[in-house]
Design a protein with these regions (language model features):
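Short, small-residue-biased leader/transition segments that mark boundaries at the very start
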Residues: 1-7
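Amphipathic, non-membrane alpha-helical rod segments
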Residues: 8-66, 79-119, 135-192, 205-245, ...
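Extended, solvent-exposed, polar/acidic, compositionally biased regions
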Residues: 74-75, 127-132, 255-258, 327, ...
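Functional cation/ligand-contacting sites centered on basic and imidazole/sulfhydryl donors
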Residues: 251, 377
Length: 474
């Protein structure tokens, strides 16, 4: 029996890696051989059979030499390293750290445990990588784009923190719980991204606002609402709504200008303007009306409406009828002032009629009336101017007192008109009547005829005086 068989060295074999990491059946074989030997050593009646003792000793040596724990541990580490190399969700730093932990393991159990942890880490890293790799898709999604800045920043911060965690080259993160917390932070931030719902709400609010815009036509509202519903972002919705409100203001201005047409038509600036300017204004109004009535395709271009508004305002500002009325009044009054046959009261009265005119046609009418009155007054004045010759004529001197008084009265009435100082006669017919009366009275004077008749009667009577000689008769 060798003293080596039961030495403490054999007892310590079970604490060595070669035993600890050996296959279980080999561990069992060694332990059984060692225990069998101990039974002989501990016998009260010692076994004296040398052959039996040598067999048990040889069994211990054989089973000890058969222990392959070191080799098994080496293979386990190699296999673990190979598996870790296939864990493609881990970073290089994580793989190297995991392999370091495996290689520093003292037992196959530790190796298996570290490998299991590496695999679990790989799983959570896959989730984390997927979330990180989905960043671009997320930030380009409606869910993110249409969210408020705080929620967007929370997501971006969660991703950035995860990227820092992932990209550690020194002391890489191997704690599964820490990785899971980063995953939870990202998922929580994603769940708080409600951009799509907010886009839907923004569209609903915008459509309601557009429908309440009183300046737009129904067709314009329909198109603006379609533009809202076609929008991909809240910013686009806001832009459409802003443009709709701006268009509404322009359309309201256009409506006011078109609706004010009758008011403009009732102003002196319009009805005293020339046809060209009035037609330009009316055409501009008609063009503006087509955008309101929808005869044009629904116009959404604010600049087009603004241009139409500008055309109307320009045409309106080019209406200077009131100024032209005043100009015509001034010209008419100058002409009236030069009508030399009217008396001063007549001129003043005619000027008052001109100044009281509301239209240029009235001014022209009063001027023509003044000219006609002036012609009538000329004829009256010319007839009155004959009075000296008339009164010195035989027709007047030798006519009857009745005819003389008739002429004198007609003459006086004519002179009364010429010499008026108040309440002027503006009725041309009345003047023509006085002229006719004076003419008739003048034509009625037949004094020369009466004188001739008287002479003839006297001669006849003288010729009857037989007592007179011829010389006396002559």
């Amino acid at each position: 029996w060798s003293s080596d068989v039961c030495s403490s060295d054999l007892e310590s074999v079970t604490n060595e890696s070669n035993y600890i990491n050996a296959e279980p059946e080999k561990q069992h074989a060694f332990t059984e051989a060692l225990n069998n030997a101990k039974e002989i050593v501990n016998e009260q009646q010692a076994t004296l059979d040398a052959n039996s003792i040598n067999q048990k000793a040889q069994a211990i040596l054989t089973t000890k030499n058969a222990l392959d724990g070191e080799e098994q541990l080496r293979r386990a580490k190699e296999n673990a390293d190979q598996e870790i190399n296939t864990l493609n969700q881990l970073t290089d730093a994580q793989r190297n750290s995991e392999k370091g932990l495996v290689n520093s393991s003292q037992t196959r159990t530790e190796v298996a445990s570290q490998l299991a942890k590496a695999k679990e880490l790989n799983k959570v890293m896959e989730q984390l990588n997927n979330l990180i790799n989905g960043k671009n898709q997320m930030i380009n999604s409606s869910k993110f784009i249409n969210e408020d800045a705080n929620q967007q920043q929370a997501y971006s911060n969660a991703i950035a923190s995860a990227e820092v965690l992932k990209n550690k080259s020194q002391n890489p993160e191997l704690d599964k719980v820490t990785i899971e917390q980063a995953i939870n932070n990202i998922n929580s931030a994603i769940n708080n991204l409600n951009g799509e719902a907010k886009l839907t709400k923004a569209k609903e609010d915008a459509v309601a606002s557009i429908n309440n815009l009183s300046g737009l036509t129904n067709e314009q509202k329909t198109k603006e609402n379609q533009a809202v519903n076609d929008s991909q972002t809240r910013d686009q919705v806001a832009n459409v709504l802003r443009d709709s409100k701006a268009l509404d203001q322009s359309m309201q201005t256009l409506r006011d200008l078109v609706n004010n047409q009758n008011v403009i038509h009732s102003t002196s600036n319009y009805f005293n303007e020339d046809s060209t300017q009035k037609n330009t204004y009316d055409n501009a109004i008609d063009n503006g009306s087509t955008y309101i009535t929808g005869q044009h395709n629904s116009e959404l271009n604010k600049s087009t409406i603004d241009q139409t508004i500008s055309q109307i305002n320009t045409a309106k500002n080019d209406l200077h009828g009131a100024e032209k009325l005043q100009r015509d009044k001034g010209t008419a009054n100058q002409e009236i002032g030069q009508l030399g046959y009217l008396n001063d009261p007549q001129k003043s009265a005619e000027e008052s009629l001109v100044n009281g005119s509301n239209t240029r046609s009235e001014v022209e009418e009063h001027l023509n009336e003044a000219k006609s009155l002036n012609n009538a007054m000329k004829q009256l004045r010319d007839k009155v101017a004959e009075k000296t010759n008339v009164k010195q004529s035989s027709d007047y001197i030798n006519d009857s007192t009745e005819h003389q008084r008739g002429y004198d009265q007609a003459l006086q009435e004519a002179e009364n008109i010429i010499n008026e100082i108040g309440n002027p006669t503006l009725n041309k017919s009345e003047i023509e009547q006085k002229l006719q009366q004076l003419t008739d009275a003048q034509n009625a004077l037949q004094g020369s005829h009466l004188l001739e008749e008287a002479k003839n009667n006297a001669i006849t009577e003288i010729n009857k005086l037989t007592a007179l000689n011829d010389a006396q008769r002559q």
